[in-house]
Amino acid sequence: DFPQNHLDLLTGKNLNIQGIEIKADGKTFFWQGRYHNDMNTRDTLATELNVLADFKPVVPESYRSAEVVLLGNLHPLVQLDVIAQMTDPKILMLDTMNFWMEHAWDDLLRVMAKVNVISINDEEARQLTGEYSLVRAAKKISEMGPDHVIIKKGEHGALLFHQQDVFYAPALPLEEV
C-alpha cells in the first residue's frame, strides 16, 4: 500500500532509497492517536504492526559504516538487529515509545544499554523510570545506557541531559497548530 509515486518523490529529491523493502502483499505500519488540547498528552487508539510484525532488516552494505545511526521507533529486536549490522557508529540514537515499554520491556532495556542517545517524551520518561521529576528520570535513563537523554515536552520544547548539564530548547509559540 505504498505507491510508486511516493518513492519517485523521494528519488526526485535525490534521496537514496536503497534500503527500502516493499512487501507487495502487506500493509504499512499504522498508528492512530488522539492528542489532547494541550498537544502534550495523547491517547493511542490503535497500533497495527502489519508488515513490521515479522520485519527482518537488511542494512545495505553502503550504509553499514555510517557514523550516525537513528534507530527508528520499531520493535527493540529489530533495533538490535540493525545495531549488529553496523560497523562502528559514533552516535547511536534510539527513538522508542510506550508501546515497546508495555510489550517488549526486556528487549528495550537491551537496546538502551547499547545506545548513547535516546529521544523520548516526558510521559514515556516517567513511565520508563517511575519518576515524576524529569531530572531524576533522565538520571535513571542514563544509568540504563544512554549518556545523552532528550526529553520532548510537546508545546514546551525539549530538554537535553548529559551528565550534570541540562540544555533547554523552548518551543516556538504558535497561534494555530
Model-derived regions, located:
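Conserved N-terminal subdomain of the carbohydrate kinase-like
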Residues: 1-70, 85-89
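A structural micro-motif
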Residues: 15, 89-91, 115, 147, ...
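Short hydrophobic/aromatic-enriched beta-strand-loop microsegments
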Residues: 16-20, 91-96, 167-171
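Short, acidic/turn-prone active-site loops that include or flank metal/cofactor-
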Residues: 22-24, 96-100, 123, 172-176
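Active-site donor-binding loop signature of nucleotide-sugar glycosyltransferases
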Residues: 35, 120, 171
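Structured loop/turn residues at beta-strand edges in well-structured enzyme cores
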Residues: 64, 113, 144
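Conserved beta-alpha-beta core of the PfkB/ribokinase-like small-molecule kinase fold
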Residues: 68-139, 157-158
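Conserved phosphate-binding/catalytic region of the ribokinase-like
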Residues: 134-177
